[in-house]
Design a protein with these regions (language model features):
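Helix N-cap at the beta1-alpha1 junction of Rossmann-like dinucleotide-binding domains, i.e.
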Residues: 36-38, 101
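C-terminal catalytic/substrate-binding lobe primarily of soluble NAD(P)-dependent oxidoreductases
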Residues: 4, 138-362
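N-terminal Rossmann-fold NAD(P) dinucleotide-binding loop
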Residues: 16-17
Length: 362
């Protein structure tokens, strides 16, 4: 009898817990992290093996991933690139969600030489919009592509109007990294937090007025869709007033992460996203919009942001493990979407976990 395929999940943080718990139902899963408390949470609730591991130590990482068929890299962004490199050097297939600043394609030659599948940016955004772009670029002529995502709380307080729904360090990266987008086929670089606009949303039985601003979320799409989609933009949703508060922090030199910016995982939070495609099909104008609205899960206690990110990752992991996706080298999420059947499989996987993307087409 053939045993279950083995997976090692590096990182037992908010998203790492979701990933390990989801995969543990069908695979032999080990979670590696520095925190015994985080590992105990998993092992007490799910059939997950655990290993206390210093993920900043390359040798420790190499030892942790040795006996496995697939690695999930769910470490903080500042550790992501080097951790991914270590995984590839060890010849292990990997799905990564760490959202690091470096260019993942710098590891493409290494991954190919090691005969490794290295899927990167397989989270909520980047991630889910990219799968759709990869799929739809073969079905229509896309002229404009935009996605806006935000993790928020129903009841906000204070001038900041916001509590992080993921790592405060990674949130601050969004606010300080120059934002790149594409207009008429040309790369435009803008300051972060620039070009804010108010958007009214009617979604999930709620009405919101949110502020959207430029962030650097296109990432690999700048390469994979170059010359294929002439206009692309990514923005982030916050409640009105938050951007002005962040700018005041930056201008006055106040602490880069306020003390009260503790990631909040509670019943009050939600994640919202709007994805828009404009173009033509067979010479006729075509518009496709996707909307997603997800809240805290009372069954697992996992936050919406953790679930959407984690289940996007586990959807890709299943595509790799069952052979649906097999391209060697660095694979951004749009590559995965371009393989027939993969995007549909991932979104069916999300739907089965109550992550719903509503499609509106004209």
């Amino acid at each position: 009898m053939v045993g279950k395929q083995k997976i090692v999940v590096l990182g037992a943080g908010r998203v790492g817990k979701v990933i390990a718990s989801d995969l543990s139902h069908d695979f032999d899963v080990t979670s590696a992290d520095m925190s015994p408390e985080a590992l105990a949470f998993l092992s007490s609730r799910y059939p997950v093996k655990t290993k206390v591991t210093d993920l900043a130590n390359r040798q420790a990482v190499a030892e942790a991933i040795e006996p496995t068929d697939l690695v999930i890299c769910a470490v903080p962004g500042f550790m992501g690139f080097n951790t991914l490199k270590t995984i590839i050097e060890r010849g292990k297939n990997v799905v990564d969600i760490s959202f690091f600043a470096e260019d993942a394609f710098k590891l493409d030659d290494l991954a190919r030489s090691k005969n490794v599948i290295a899927a990167v940016d397989c989270g909520v955004a980047p991630g889910t919009p990219d799968y759709l772009a990869g799929q739809l670029v073969h079905q229509m002529q896309i002229e404009d592509f935009e996605f806006i995502c935000g993790g928020l709380h129903f009841h906000r307080s204070g001038p900041e109007q916001y509590l992080p729904t993921f790592s405060p360090t990674d949130v601050w990266e969004e606010y300080t990294r120059p934002a790149r987008y594409v207009r008429d086929g040309k790369l435009i670089v803008m300051p972060p937090l620039s070009e804010p606009e108010l958007i009214d949303l009617h979604i999930g039985g709620h009405e919101f007025t949110l502020e959207a601003f430029n962030t650097d979320g296109l990432r690999s799409l700048l390469t994979t869709m170059h010359g294929r989609i002439p206009n692309m933009r990514e923005k982030t949703f916050r409640f009105p007033g938050h951007i002005a508060w962040i700018k005041r922090l930056q201008e006055t030199g106040q602490p880069w992460v306020p003390e009260k910016w503790t990631p909040a995982e509670d019943q009050d939070e939600f994640t919202v996203m709007r994805i828009s495609f404009r173009g033509s099909e067979n010479g006729k104008p075509k518009k496709i919009d996707y909307t997603m609205f997800v809240t805290w899960d009372p069954t697992t206690g996992f936050s919406s942001m953790s679930r959407v990110t984690g289940y996007s990752c586990t959807g890709v992991a299943r595509c790799v493990l069952d052979g649906a996706y097999a391209r060697k080298g660095i694979s951004p999420p749009s590559y995965i979407g371009e393989v027939p059947g993969c995007a549909d499989k991932i979104f069916a996987h999300l739907q089965a976990r109550n992550i719903l993307f509503e499609r509106h087409e004209e």
